[in-house]
Amino acid sequence: MSKFLNKIVNGNALEILKTIPSKTFNLVLANLLTISQIGKKLKRPDNSNVNGVNDKWDQFKSFKDYDIFCKEWLNECKRVLKDNGSIWVIGTYHNIFRIGYHIQNVGYWMLNDVIWRKNNPMPNFKGTRFTNAHETLIWASKSKKSKYTFNYQSLKCLNDDLQMRSDWTFPICNGKERLKKNGKKVHSTQKPEALLHRIILSTTNKDDVILDPFLGTGTTAVVAKKLGRKYFGIEKDKKYFKAADERINKTKAIEESYLDTLENNKSKPRVPFGSLVELGIIKPGTNIFDQKKKINAKIMVDGSIKHKESAGSIHKVAAKIMGTESYNGWTYWYCNVGNSIVPIDKLRQKFLSKNI
């Protein structure tokens, strides 16, 4: 497994994918190869050339060849995905509809399509079409039964406590982030790190392993490294591979203590305090106390607690002490575990980790 952790390789994606053990990755993230339709040089109003997507990697002889290629790599990516893994693909009107068709036929389960709206798109200089101001992202789980990762609360926090929508606005990659050599772009479709940050933060957890089969100049690996995720990337083009390798080596990970994210509320099944008493996890007669150890209470056989003349649930007694209508007793009360003092919520979490 270590062979595929935090490494990138220069080679053919299909050939390398076939060497990877099944169920290796938590997430696949692919910026799609396309069939370019530009066909000839475009001119800006000042008569300078428009750098369309004319890279060698962007050329296929026919739709048939492209379809065969897509089915092959999608099947291989499905094989190397863990059962609860998911896949993101990023594309344009040139290819996203074809790839969506193949994603469903291969057996993935569609979760969302997301619109990346560019607030600084390249204009349509000929004035013959609408300005192409967006790209489409498809997010799908390995199967209908997959318990995929979706960090709902973190996304809501990112969006000022509003549900994150499926239309995202980011600028195209520019400024210092855009890789250039001799004043020219190293890669014509380098994605902005902000876009990948949202994808990776929303659908993976710390230490998850991410595969990018078409790495380009390494944006997926760079963002994965920053966010404490592991990565494996494949890139066929030697120029892009070299640029990605240099870029990844220069990237510094965010300090681990800052990588904590909000947990989803739905991920915590309800466990009554009385259940912990019934199961012997905490015994009747145990002394519990507040964080400063100034207030004490005793646990009764039915899961209630007594503090002086007050008796009731851990929540009601805590609320009465605090002078409020309600209070979270799980975080108010502490107990001794060995030589440590821990909130009683730790006992609940220990129970959940063993039984859920």
Predicted regions and their residues:
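S-adenosyl-L-methionine
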Residues: 2-17, 246-271
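Short alpha-helix boundary/capping motifs
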Residues: 105, 131, 227, 251-253, ...
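Class I S-adenosyl-L-methionine
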Residues: 100, 104, 242-245, 249-252
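Intrinsically disordered, charged low-complexity linkers and terminal tails
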Residues: 226, 230, 238, 243-246, ...
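Conserved acidic E/D residue at the C-terminus of a beta-strand in Rossmann-like folds
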Residues: 235
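Core catalytic lobe of class I
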Residues: 1-232
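Acidic/polar loop patches that form or flank catalytic/metal-binding clefts of enzymes
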Residues: 148-151, 256, 328
